[in-house]
Amino acid sequence: MEVLRQMLVHKANNSSMSTHKGLNRTEPVRMTYDHCELLGQLSTLNFSAASNTFSSGYNTTIKGSAPKTIQTVSSLFSKDITKAMSDIGNLVARMFPTASAERAAVILDITVFGFIADDLLEDAALSSDSEAFDKLHMLMLRLVRNDSFSEDEYPEYQNLIRFTRPIFTKFQALASRTLLNRFAYTYQEYLQGVQWEASLQPNQIPDFETCKNVKRHVGAWLCYFVLAEFAREIEVPITVRGNLEVQKFVTLACDIASYDNDTFLLKKEIRDGVVSNTIVITYLHGAKRLQDALDRILEMRKQTESEILAITSNLPHFGKDDKVAREYINALTCVIGGNFEWCSKTTRYQDPK
């Protein structure tokens, strides 16, 4: 990609980049971060170039389970946490259109848990207390793995435990042990990405590739891709998941979903001072205007979409596993297509009144 090549050249020429001896990594670039300047450009942004090729569908069974889940959340958590949950049923309905009513309900609950966990982790007081932050991380992993532990260890999170325990007990009952372990592993990777994102400072901007690689995990897309198998009641063998073309497809699908979230969250994240948005990073690494940075990311998304379509048109044959491989690819395209449709329409990402 020409845009990416230019970014990497810019990074290589930036004298403020420093490499630790013996370590294959670079420190974030220290550069001026003018929050007011970014805020001033929000009103002129044009998102009309955002488009999506991947279709999904709509799972009508979610309509029955979503209100009950939202009601339970409202009874256990603050209004600040629950205010953005009203539309979450539409996200799951679009990403997992073929899931049975029973499995769709579990996926909905897991997704709600993920949103609640995100809100808890974003608490400013928690992020400044590393011990408390790590404690919450450990609790979340224990809940996702459905481990046995004394709830007395977490008096401040009784409502989170009360809400989450039944979800992963049900998930464990329906999913294979392998699928459960894979989900727990991807969720642990996701939490590490969240921790990295929380460590960023406005005057320490990571390079574009580092940010993109981490955001493949921060967006929890690998978790959703495991849930896509669960929704279709399939388990993709390692011979398929380990195939280089399939691995490339998964990576590109993560990138597209991250680009979409960054696009539709852009205004909110700029207001919140978030610097890990790839559009913001593109702007801070040399784009003259925020609109230029947005257009670059949308162009990269378009090219990534073309690469995905090329892979799906030329998938290798997997013998007896060929049917499940193709269903897996179809399931992942539903996830990214449904995410785009939801992000572009949900009130969660609209301008505040």
Curated annotation (Swiss-Prot):
Which cofactors?
A: Mg(2+)
Q: List positions binding Mg(2+) 1.
A: 118
Protein name as annotated: Terpene synthase 3
Write the Enzyme Commission number(s) for this entry: 4.2.3.-
Q: Where is this site: Plays a critical role in the stabilization of intermediate cation?
A: 115
Q: Which source organism?
A: Physarum polycephalum
UniProt keyword terms in alphabetical order: Lyase, Magnesium, Metal-binding
Renumbered ranges of motif WxxxxxRY motif: 342-349
Gene, per the UniProt record: TPS3
